[in-house]
Amino acid sequence: QILPGDSNPGETESIIELTREQIKLEESAAKSKIIETQREQEKFKIGVIDIPSFYRDYRALKSGDEEFTSTTSDVRRLLSNLEKDEIDALVIDLRNNGGGHLTEATALTGLFIDNGPVVQLRNANGRISRLDDPDPVPRSAYNGPLLVLVNRYSASASEIFAAAIQDYERGI
């Protein structure tokens, strides 16, 4: 029920019904492809992973499903497939990625750095908390050349990921 701010006492409230749609994670899921290129006489395979948003299936996670869908688990699987195809370099495409789950940005960063802090957060009281790479194994999932693409529509979690990769001098 709503009552406009400029209404008079005793006016009837309006009822507005909202229906929340189920978001299909498949539409936002990370996807990969390989671009083959040649420079002089040498051929190269460039793996490209497009990440439209940072997502996590909290319903599956809460129910105890260890195979829950998330940006990090999907990218880990895509990386494994790209490495089987013997890519020479990797591009993470975050253009037009408006962000999403911060925990996924920190976890995804952990696939490319050995360990360490990813971002610091300051709350309204000025208290600072640090989010580290959550992976307890100090080893990255991919060690080759890395490029992260962003544009003016990349925001929030995508900016945090891109900045961490740059701060750790892990990619450009």
Region spans (language model):
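Cleft-lining beta-strand/loop regions that shape enzyme active-site pockets
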Residues: Q1-I172
